[in-house]
Design a protein with these regions (language model features):
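Membrane-embedded alpha-helical bundles of multi-pass enzymes
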Residues: 1-182, 389, 400-403, 415-417, ...
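Soluble catalytic domains of enzymes that build or remodel membrane lipids, polysaccharides, and related
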Residues: 184-457
Length: 482
């Protein structure tokens, strides 16, 4: 019965990542804690395995568009750190019951977000809370604090139901009040932004085969924006943003892409941030493609940011010599991408615009680095066409909303095929597109220079979590499973 309940708990937590279901994450974790309560290690291991496999099988099901083997492999990698949750006893009568499971989740999520190959920070409990009251705590302790408090609330819920604990109920009320008391930053300065969603000819991961199709779509949609500006229907933007891979032809190589973009930029009062794959070559450092954001003015390309956090098995192939013998589709990635160095911050008429590309928005440390480099507002250039009609675009948009609240920065998302949108620094969405349509996002975003506590001190929750576990688990760390 507990085995089935653990599977159900995993499904409930996966469901919590859908819009408006933030509370289900607390319920799912409470069910898991109930299943693990006072059970021996081997039983905890089996139940935690059932929970994590179910959770991630649902949550990252979208990766199956690349193949069921990719889906299976990712589920296993995401599940492995959760096995730490089974190492320490769960006892609802223990004085550490509220905090020890929370500390375990904080540590295992930190491991999963950074290992292996840079980690995969998807499916963190914190991201399920973007529509809930706990998300406000992200300004203090980032994703670690929010995830930890989700588990604390789950433990409190179990205490209230199992023991009719009045003190636990008061603690839950106290957490709610603390969450509600966190306020957003304000600014008198703002910037007018526009994002271009040109759309793609079809769903899938073979867009590169449709030479110039994506480029032409984004040229046409930008022409539409310029016409609306000229007619007075749309305010003049300070910056126009194309998505990742907004041009499927390298614009830094002289030719039709460079000519068309330069002609467009000459008629625009605002610079255009182009997303493109370009070729990097640097003698001793080697060469390869880069995933770049290129600031294009009427004088041509100027500032360039290249993606730092490359996607393993998407933009480069770890263990290529071994895996390529068994998985033939890695032939579609003949050259490993070259990572950029350092955050991307563009000066646009005095405004400091940070730029991140696609999955980079899920890496908290990279967003913090971008803000610490001076970013007052952040653009996200992304291409989610491969995962169209799955839950991936909505999940990534929710992560971006979380980042906006956590860092108190407005985020402009430009996607080739959706979802694009303008997210204010309080997480509210002032413009949002549907998938697989040509669309324009416009709006005003505040320019904020003040930094949240979590941005200035990003690791304090994790450090306390590790120290707490070392202190409370000295007698419980196993040399082997019983």
């Amino acid at each position: 019965m507990r085995f089935l309940a653990s599977i159900f708990a995993g499904a409930i937590v996966a469901w919590s990542f859908y819009p408006g279901h933030w509370w289900a994450s607390v319920v799912g974790m409470a069910i898991l804690l109930l299943c693990l309560d006072s059970k021996p290690r081997k039983t905890r291991l089996k139940l935690t395995l059932a929970f994590a496999l179910t959770f991630f099988a649902f949550h990252v099901q979208w990766v199956s568009v690349l193949g069921n083997d990719a889906w299976f492999g990712l589920v296993i990698l995401c599940t492995l750190p959760w096995m730490l949750f089974a190492l320490l006893p769960i006892d609802s009568r223990s004085k550490w019951f509220y905090l020890q499971p929370a500390a375990l989740v904080i540590v295992l999520e930190a491991i999963r977000a950074s290992w292996p190959w840079g980690g995969f920070p998807w499916g963190l409990l914190a991201y399920s809370q973007v529509d809930g009251p706990l998300v406000a705590l992200s300004t203090i302790g980032g994703q670690s604090l929010v995830s930890g408090v989700v588990v604390v609330c789950a433990a409190i819920t179990l205490k209230v139901i199992k023991f009719r604990s009045f003190s636990a109920l008061m603690l839950l009320l106290f957490i709610s009040i603390c969450s509600a008391s966190v306020s957003s930053f304000n600014s008198n300065d703002s910037v007018q932004l526009a994002a271009i969603q040109g759309n793609v000819p079809r769903v899938g991961n073979e867009l590169s085969a449709q030479r110039a199709a994506v480029l032409n779509n984004h040229l046409r949609t930008t022409e539409q924006l310029l016409a609306e500006i000229e007619s007075g229907l749309t305010p003049e933007p300070d910056l126009i943003v194309w998505p990742e891979s907004g041009t499927d032809i390298d614009p830094l190589v002289p030719g039709i892409a460079a000519d068309a973009i330069s002609e467009l930029a000459s008629r625009s009062a605002a610079p255009i941030l182009i997303g493109a794959t370009t070729w990097y070559s640097s003698g001793s450092e080697g060469e390869g493609p880069t995933n770049s954001g290129i600031m294009w003015t009427d004088n041509g390309p100027s500032q360039i940011y290249s993606k730092n956090h490359l996607v393993p098995f998407g933009e480069y192939v770890p263990l290529r010599d071994v895996l390529a013998k068994w998985i033939t589709r890695f032939d579609q990635i003949p050259n490993d991408f070259v990572p950029g160095e350092g955050p991307g911050v563009f000066d646009v008429s005095g405004a400091q615009i940070g730029d991140v590309i696609c999955f980079e928005v899920a890496y908290a440390n990279h967003i913090y680095d971008t803000i610490n480099a001076g970013a007052q507002v952040i653009t996200v250039q992304t291409n989610n066409a491969t995962y169209g009609n799955t839950t991936q675009p909505e999940q990534q948009f929710a992560i971006t909303r979380f980042r906006a609240i956590e860092t108190q920065r407005a985020f402009l998302v430009a996607s080739t095929s959706g979802i694009s949108g303008l997210i204010q620094n309080d997480g509210s969405v002032t413009d949002k597109t549907k998938q697989f349509e040509s669309a324009i996002v416009t709006g005003e975003a505040p320019l904020i220079s003040e930094k949240t506590f979590s941005t200035k001190y990003p690791y304090w929750v994790l450090i306390i979590g590790v120290m707490f576990l070392l202190f409370t688990s000295r007698k419980n760390l196993p040399t082997r499973f019983k």
